């Protein structure tokens, strides 16, 4: 008994060393873990097991004891048995403490029996269900550290609805079903590591879009946070949970990951840039290849063109080449090598080669007598030499025309052309207008036609010449246009000299003046009529006598002949002031003598018919005729007639007599005392008397005074000092009017 009563120390077998307490519990399932091993009963027979049975048992034990690589709930040593038993005891105690939580305690049952449904207190159930929920902060954690959440799980989840409570109980029981010892040592929320390659990462970024990250500022916490996308908005919150240990280490890991991501993105960006650079270099290489090929083709073409030009020069030197054949040779070159023709400016070479042939063709040409000479040759070369889309002034064709055509036209226009015979020059310009460049055409007008025409206008004498000036000036209006404005001033001055001594009986003046109504501007024409024509017509109407018995209408018809030329308001004013007062007065006296009304009506209608339509349709003229008709009606009805204009004419005649007397006095004063005229007016009057022109020179000043042209002499009018200065040999000296006139005649004689 002594030896058998002792506790025999159990030896560790090979299976215990391999399988631990699991194998022990299986082999000693009949005994308790700490009990003494029973004695062997030697009376029973020995049992033998075959090798196959032993292997089967070992395999079964190994299969039952297989541990998952990711399962950390069971310790691989025998010590874990005691630890697991203690953990199982703690779990039972926790279940007892939370019994009311999962089974619905007596307090909740009593409240339910009294009608409480788990909602807020109050009539409208507006009270809070749970009291203020608090949560203990971890040790040494300040306010706002790692976005710590102040509010976590509800303090009393048992206050939920009964249905939710029952459901939660079922779920809780089902979740806690099984062996608690194994669940206690299992890691919860195991994070599986996910590995991605650089290609997968770049593919993911490509789906999101490179460079499309938005800068998002999160202001929900005590401190602002900057995130790149909404995907990462809650990433840091999860990473900085209060239950997570070592946030600095996790921050460093995230920093390393982000650095790797940035490195991958930078490498990918550099790779894409290098690929783009390689592609652009390849394209540039192809471009250079095409340029080299094009230059080689151009070089070959230029060699052929140079050889062709050398052959053309040899043929020209031998005299075997004409203008037509030369033009055909260059047309072939332009059609065969259009790019080379334009690039090398072969039109200039063609123009230089054709110039001697054109000079030979137009040698001795008279443009005024034979305007169409050589126009066909010029037309063919115009198409060959003109460069398309060339806005420059100097072109090969314009240079050719300026050296061949322009000199001949200039010589013929200056030496041969007579301005009073405009047809030859007009025919020449009309024939060559389409062939001449616009610049050369304007040069001919400004340097040949206009100066020659201006000299002819200045030398025109309207009293001596029988051909009106508009015969040889008006044909140039469509061609010269506004360039004749300076000549119009000279023509108006010539008209003024002519009209000073004009009488209305001279109908030739109307023939000379009327064509210029549409040429001069309205203000200049009205001024000319008011100054020279209207006063003479006024005198004619004043001298006109109205006699029903023996009426002479010659003077009246002379006045009516100017209706189309004189502005209508001036002519109406003349008739109201100087014709109708006489006419109404004669009608009044005739009606007072008991006449025959048939004769009066015939006389009335006859006078009305003598007025031109444009004048009789005027409202003011109609009023005057209506006054005469009213007088006749009063006489027929035996009504008392008032003398026409009795009251108005008294003041009118007085005012008229006063104006006439003042006018005569003014004229007499000017004759008696010429100093009443301004200094400039006196010089102008002297120039008009001598039929000379006094006009300012545009943009010519000397010591602040305008320089005028008196005939052929340059003068200065110093009105402040009443001095007249003339220029001779570059010097200015004072002169009188007679000396100035002698200087003009001397200049004319010197030119002749």
From Swiss-Prot:
<feature type="domain" description="G-patch">
    <location>
        <begin position="103"/>
        <end position="148"/>
    </location>
</feature>
<dbReference type="InterPro" id="IPR022783">
    <property type="entry name" value="GCFC_dom"/>
</dbReference>
<keyword id="KW-0539">Nucleus</keyword>
<dbReference type="GO" id="GO:0003677">
    <property type="term" value="F:DNA binding"/>
</dbReference>
<keyword id="KW-0747">Spliceosome</keyword>
<feature type="region of interest" description="Disordered">
    <location>
        <begin position="1"/>
        <end position="52"/>
    </location>
</feature>
<dbReference type="GO" id="GO:0005681">
    <property type="term" value="C:spliceosomal complex"/>
</dbReference>
<keyword id="KW-0508">mRNA splicing</keyword>
<keyword id="KW-0238">DNA-binding</keyword>
<comment type="subunit">
    <text>Identified in the spliceosome C complex.</text>
</comment>
<comment type="function">
    <text>Involved in pre-mRNA splicing, specifically in spliceosome disassembly during late-stage splicing events.</text>
</comment>
<dbReference type="GO" id="GO:0010600">
    <property type="term" value="P:regulation of auxin biosynthetic process"/>
</dbReference>
<feature type="short sequence motif" description="Nuclear localization signal">
    <location>
        <begin position="36"/>
        <end position="48"/>
    </location>
</feature>
<feature type="compositionally biased region" description="Basic residues">
    <location>
        <begin position="35"/>
        <end position="45"/>
    </location>
</feature>
<dbReference type="Pfam" id="PF12457">
    <property type="entry name" value="TIP_N"/>
</dbReference>
<feature type="compositionally biased region" description="Basic and acidic residues">
    <location>
        <begin position="1"/>
        <end position="17"/>
    </location>
</feature>
<dbReference type="GO" id="GO:0004674">
    <property type="term" value="F:protein serine/threonine kinase activity"/>
</dbReference>
<protein>
    <recommendedName>
        <fullName>Septin and tuftelin-interacting protein 1 homolog 2</fullName>
    </recommendedName>
</protein>
<comment type="similarity">
    <text>Belongs to the TFP11/STIP family.</text>
</comment>
<dbReference type="GO" id="GO:0006468">
    <property type="term" value="P:protein phosphorylation"/>
</dbReference>
<dbReference type="Pfam" id="PF01585">
    <property type="entry name" value="G-patch"/>
</dbReference>
<dbReference type="InterPro" id="IPR022159">
    <property type="entry name" value="STIP/TFIP11_N"/>
</dbReference>
<dbReference type="Pfam" id="PF07842">
    <property type="entry name" value="GCFC"/>
</dbReference>
<dbReference type="InterPro" id="IPR000467">
    <property type="entry name" value="G_patch_dom"/>
</dbReference>
<dbReference type="InterPro" id="IPR045211">
    <property type="entry name" value="TFP11/STIP/Ntr1"/>
</dbReference>
<keyword id="KW-0507">mRNA processing</keyword>
<dbReference type="GO" id="GO:0000390">
    <property type="term" value="P:spliceosomal complex disassembly"/>
</dbReference>
């Amino acid at each position: 008994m002594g030896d058998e009563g002792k506790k025999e120390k159990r030896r560790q077998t090979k299976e215990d060393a391999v399988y631990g307490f699991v194998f022990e519990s299986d082999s000693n399932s009949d005994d308790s873990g700490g009990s003494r091993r029973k004695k062997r009963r030697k009376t029973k027979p020995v049992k033998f097991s075959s090798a196959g049975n032993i292997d089967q048992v070992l395999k079964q034990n190994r299969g039952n004891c297989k541990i998952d690589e990711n399962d950390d709930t069971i310790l691989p040593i025998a010590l874990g048995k005691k630890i697991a038993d203690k953990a199982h005891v703690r779990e039972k105690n926790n279940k007892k403490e939370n019994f009311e939580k999962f089974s619905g305690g007596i307090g909740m049952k009593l409240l339910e029996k009294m009608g409480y449904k788990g909602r807020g207190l109050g009539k409208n159930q507006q009270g809070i269900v749970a009291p203020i929920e608090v949560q203990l902060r971890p040790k040494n954690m300040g306010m706002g550290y790692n976005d710590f959440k102040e509010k976590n799980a509800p303090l009393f989840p048992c206050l939920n609805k009964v249905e939710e409570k029952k459901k939660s109980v079922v779920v809780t029981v089902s979740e806690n079903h099984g062996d608690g010892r194994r669940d206690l040592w299992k890691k919860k929320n195991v994070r599986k590591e996910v590995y991605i390659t650089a290609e997968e990462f770049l593919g993911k970024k490509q789906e999101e879009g490179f460079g499309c990250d938005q800068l998002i500022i999160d202001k929900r916490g005590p401190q602002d946070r900057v995130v790149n996308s909404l995907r990462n908005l809650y990433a840091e919150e999860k990473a900085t949970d209060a239950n997570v240990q070592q946030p600095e280490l996790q921050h460093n890991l995230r920093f390393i990951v982000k650095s790797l991501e940035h490195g991958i993105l930078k490498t990918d960006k550099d790779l894409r840039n290098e690929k783009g650079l390689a592609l652009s270099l390849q394209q540039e290489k192809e471009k250079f290849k095409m340029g080299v090929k094009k230059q080689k083709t151009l070089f070959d073409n230029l060699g052929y063109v140079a050889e062709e030009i050398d052959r053309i020069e040899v043929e020209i030197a031998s005299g075997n080449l004409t203008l037509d054949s030369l033009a055909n040779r260059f047309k072939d070159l332009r059609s065969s090598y259009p790019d080379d023709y334009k690039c090398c400016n072969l039109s200039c070479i063609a123009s230089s080669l054709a110039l001697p042939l054109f000079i030979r063709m137009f040698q001795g040409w008279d443009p005024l007598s034979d305007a169409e000479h050589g126009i066909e040759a010029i037309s063919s070369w115009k198409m060959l030499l003109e460069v398309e889309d060339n806005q420059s002034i100097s072109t090969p064709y314009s240079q050719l025309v300026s050296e061949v055509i322009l000199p001949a036209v200039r010589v013929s226009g200056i030496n041969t052309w007579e301005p009073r015979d405009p047809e030859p020059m007009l025919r020449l310009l009309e024939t060559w207008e389409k062939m001449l460049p616009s610049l050369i055409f304007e040069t001919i007008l400004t340097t040949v036609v206009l100066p020659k025409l201006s000299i002819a206008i200045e030398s025109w004498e309207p009293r001596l010449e029988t051909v009106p000036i508009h015969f040889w000036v008006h044909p140039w209006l469509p061609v010269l246009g506004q360039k004749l404005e300076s000549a119009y001033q000279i023509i108006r001055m010539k008209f003024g000299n002519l009209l000073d001594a004009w009488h209305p009986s001279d109908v030739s003046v109307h023939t000379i003046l009327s064509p210029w109504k549409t040429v001069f501007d309205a203000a200049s024409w009205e001024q000319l009529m008011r100054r020279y024509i209207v006063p003479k017509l006024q005198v004619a109407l004043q001298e006109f006598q109205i006699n029903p018995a023996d009426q002479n209408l010659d003077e009246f018809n002379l006045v009516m002949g100017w209706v189309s030329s004189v502005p209508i308001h001036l002519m109406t004013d003349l008739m109201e002031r100087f014709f109708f007062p006489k006419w109404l007065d004669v009608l009044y006296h005739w009606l007072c003598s008991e006449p025959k009304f048939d004769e009066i009506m015939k006389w009335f209608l006859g006078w009305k018919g003598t007025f031109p339509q444009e004048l009789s349709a005027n409202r003011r003229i109609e009023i005057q005729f209506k006054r005469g008709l009213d007088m006749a009606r009063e006489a027929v009805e035996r009504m008392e007639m008032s003398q026409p204009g009795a009251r108005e004419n008294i003041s009118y005649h007085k005012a008229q007599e006063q104006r006439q007397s003042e006018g005569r006095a003014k004229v007499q004063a000017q004759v008696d005392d010429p100093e009443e005229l301004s200094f400039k007016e006196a010089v102008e009057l002297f120039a008009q008397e001598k039929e000379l022109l006094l006009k300012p020179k545009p943009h010519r000043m000397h010591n602040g005074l305008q320089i005028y042209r008196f005939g052929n002499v340059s003068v200065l009018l110093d009105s402040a000092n009443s001095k007249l200065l003339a220029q001779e040999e570059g010097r200015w000296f004072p002169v009188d009017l007679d000396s100035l006139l002698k200087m003009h005649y001397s200049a004319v004689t010197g030119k002749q």
